[in-house]
């Protein structure tokens, strides 16, 4: 290899390096705001205090803890008129919980993030009678990562905490299965 060829290879590598960095997976560093589900009291501040027009906080469903109940206390109102899926019988004001029949007597519940407003009503219902498989979390793809999160400043229970970027969510421990 001649000196000229060697210089061409080195120059090509130096010119290509910045473009190759675009395709490299970036390692996340730092900390994010997150809600500790064991401290959250579903006060409603997540819905009203986020700087975004629609809160970055959403209800999440931890399927490993769910009982897939016929009567889900996160889905239905406590004082429902009838046992059906009419709007006045449901807990969620925006119809963000989608109920799907699995097999008798089990149903699966999914959260439609587009409709969820982080009011916490379903979370409160699930915690009052169910397994607590519904809880609120700051969704990383929606959050603008404010230096001083406005929700964290007004959270009455101190549920907002900083978590490492490599573990951006706090999940509840699934109930232990006794054999």
What are these regions (language model features)?
Residues 1-179:
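Non-ligating segments of multi-cofactor redox enzymes
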